[in-house]
């Protein structure tokens, strides 16, 4: 019996809730990833997804960790969506930064990516380990956190909680800097360039992956030292981008308009694409292992 049957009821109820950037952004990352899945990955993901998807794919469930994190039984996951870094250092170090507010080590987005990668990898290599983990949850958490770590302000400064306490105006709307990067840049892009159609935006990013970014894709896929996942690299990239683009010219009270939007949108688009490529590469490395997940 599949271990995630009870969770399916929660999943199917929550995934159809109110739409937000979390759903759009994470849907985009996972939809891009699906286009790069190898055959073994396609088969494994299909086995792990809830049967109620009605033909849908991984992308339909990639916002689930955001939907559940405020529920009492899942509040422990809230710290796994980000990693805070010291003010103005503009760098990331796992041993220094990956902990929760109580200094429990490994409780951050990069630690979570390592953890859920190892869970899936352990079960893929040894079918006896399948019984120890909820592999559907592991897949969905890994897929979601891979998107989170590519959002620059999910590695932002501790002092402003990744831009959450920096109050700005996005055009005529009051917001905070983190929300601008989570929501407003993508929302404005959808309205301005894609007739408010997320599928059209995804198609545009898919075209860039085949053309403008095609020479970069192999390096995006690669992982040093034969690791299955490289979240430390992704977090280091993100805090560098946060300093160069997110925080720059975005002090409290600033009105952010066309200049900020047009110069930051390419960064957001590329991070969505990199997140998709790297999620696919990670899952391909995991599910290429023997034996397969035959016990599911």
Swiss-Prot record:
Keywords: Disulfide bond, Endonuclease, Glycoprotein, Hydrolase, Metal-binding, Nuclease, Signal, Zinc. It comes from the Eukaryota. Binds 3 divalent metal cations. Residues 1-20 form the signal peptide. The keyword Disulfide bond applies. Its EC number is 3.1.30.1. It catalyses: Endonucleolytic cleavage to 5'-phosphomononucleotide and 5'-phosphooligonucleotide end-products. CDD domains: S1-P1_nuclease. Glycans are attached at residues 115, 134, 173, 195. GO terms for molecular function: endonuclease activity; metal ion binding; nucleic acid binding; RNA endonuclease activity; single-stranded DNA endodeoxyribonuclease activity; T/G mismatch-specific endonuclease activity. The keyword Disulfide bond applies. A divalent metal cation 2 binds at residues 154, 178, 182. The record marks 66, 69 as: Important for catalytic activity. Its cofactor is Zn(2+). It holds the Pfam family S1-P1_nuclease. Disulfide bonds join 30-62, 90-243, 98-108, 223-230. A divalent metal cation 3 binds at residues 21, 26, 148. Optimum pH is 8 with RNA and ssDNA as substrates. Residues 281-296 form a propeptide. InterPro entries: PLipase_C/P1_nuclease_dom_sf, S1/P1nuclease. It is an enzyme of class 3 (hydrolase). Hydrolyzes, with low efficiency, only single-stranded DNA and RNA without apparent specificity for bases. Endonuclease that recognizes and cleaves some mismatches with high efficiency, including heteroduplex double-stranded DNA; mostly efficient on T/G, A/G and G/G mismatches, less efficient for T/T and poorly efficient for C/C, A/A, T/C and A/C. Belongs to the nuclease type I family. Monomer. This is Endonuclease 5.
